[in-house]
């Protein structure tokens, strides 16, 4: 029997590759729920609804009775302070559950995408490599409330959660993406004849980090949601290697064709304010698609992304033991994504 996945928050970082992954298997059809839907085709059906609006969710989902798997990838709008609304995020998830549960008699599994903020990575140094059973920091965190909500409501269906770190992808439609930040920043430095300085403290340059590729995350989500041993469990999902920006920065510079610079901490969100004319010149000279720098990259996100002067590393032992053994070279992944942006005429 065909599985039917409902992806709530289908415009987010984790959802695009999940849609591709599921549709590559003829045993799946996909319902993509988003505030702004796209064109439905084949086994993909787009549904419009505001997840903050419970009655609207119920109306939009009431006729879709065949859902077997719910993948919840949505997040409430938030800034880059690291703190996100517990109330808003729990309300959105509850609205989707309230709409799906009464009509989806075949519902088997609800999967929740979380992240390393579960371990308090946004608050300061934390125990690494982070393990799924590490104690929760005693602070408000919507991940805790969402997971507890699923655990309470799971009757006749199971829940699970994935915990990626920063997600990297080729996603021209999404500015909150470290790949385009790096690419645009390097291009501007090269245009101005300036060195490719690292824009964060030395502690960040030397700390151990890991990454999560969006496609690898999608495949892991499918595995977790369909593997009996993963029922009612959470799993870290990262590429499986670790790196230091000190080692990766020269590789990026070589790929872009610029000399690596020094560690020079500054706010990228402030640095970029007068760079649009420079970017316009780059666009004209390289025949790129016309764009605004703020549409290419989220510079406030960049400040948050590189700010952590401590290790951000997660253990994948539990995921591997469950049978998902894929790994990915993070350096190669980043270079490959930059190459795809160049080929798409988004970056030079």
Predicted regions and their residues:
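Conserved beta-loop-beta element that borders a ligand/cofactor-binding pocket
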Residues: 149-177
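N-terminal Rossmann NAD(P)H-binding glycine-rich loop of SDR-like oxidoreductase domains
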Residues: 3-25
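NAD(P)H-binding glycine-rich loop region in Rossmannoid oxidoreductase-like domains
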Residues: 38-95
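Conserved glycine-rich Rossmann-like NAD(P)H-binding loop of the short-chain dehydrogenase/reductase
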Residues: 26-37
């Amino acid at each position: 029997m065909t599985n039917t996945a409902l992806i709530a928050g289908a415009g987010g970082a984790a959802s695009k590759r999940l849609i591709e992954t599921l549709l590559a298997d003829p045993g799946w059809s996909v319902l993509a729920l988003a505030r702004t839907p796209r064109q439905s085709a084949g086994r993909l059906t787009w549904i419009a609804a505001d997840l903050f609006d419970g009655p609207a969710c119920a109306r939009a989902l009431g006729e879709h009775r065949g859902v077997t798997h719910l993948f919840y990838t949505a997040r409430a709008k938030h800034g880059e302070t690291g703190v996100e609304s517990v109330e808003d995020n729990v309300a959105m998830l509850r609205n989707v559950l309230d709409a799906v549960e009464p009509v989806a008699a075949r519902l088997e599994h609800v999967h929740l995408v979380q992240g390393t903020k579960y371990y308090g990575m946004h608050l300061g140094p934390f125990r690494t490599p982070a393990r799924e059973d590490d104690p929760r920091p005693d602070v408000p965190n919507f991940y805790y409330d969402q997971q507890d909500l699923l655990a309470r409501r799971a009757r006749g269906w199971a829940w699970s959660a994935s915990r990626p770190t920063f997600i990297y992808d080729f996603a021209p439609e999404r500015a909150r993406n470290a790949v385009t930040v790096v690419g645009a920043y390097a291009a501007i430095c090269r245009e101005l004849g300036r060195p490719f300085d690292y824009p964060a403290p030395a502690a960040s340059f030397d700390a151990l980090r890991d990454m999560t590729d969006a496609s690898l995350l999608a495949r892991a989500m499918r595995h977790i949601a369909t593997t009996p041993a993963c029922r009612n469990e959470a799993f870290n999902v990262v590429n499986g290697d670790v790196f230091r920006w000190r080692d990766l920065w020269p590789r990026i510079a070589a790929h872009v064709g610029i000399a690596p610079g020094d560690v020079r901490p500054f706010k990228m969100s402030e640095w970029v304010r007068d760079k649009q004319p420079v970017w316009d010149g780059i666009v004209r000279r390289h025949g790129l698609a016309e764009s605004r720098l703020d549409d290419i990259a989220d510079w406030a996100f960049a400040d948050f992304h590189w700010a952590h002067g401590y290790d951000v590393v997660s253990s994948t032992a539990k995921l591997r033991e469950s049978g998902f053994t894929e790994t990915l070279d993070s350096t190669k992944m980043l270079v490959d994504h930059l190459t795809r942006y160049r080929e798409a005429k988004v970056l030079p």
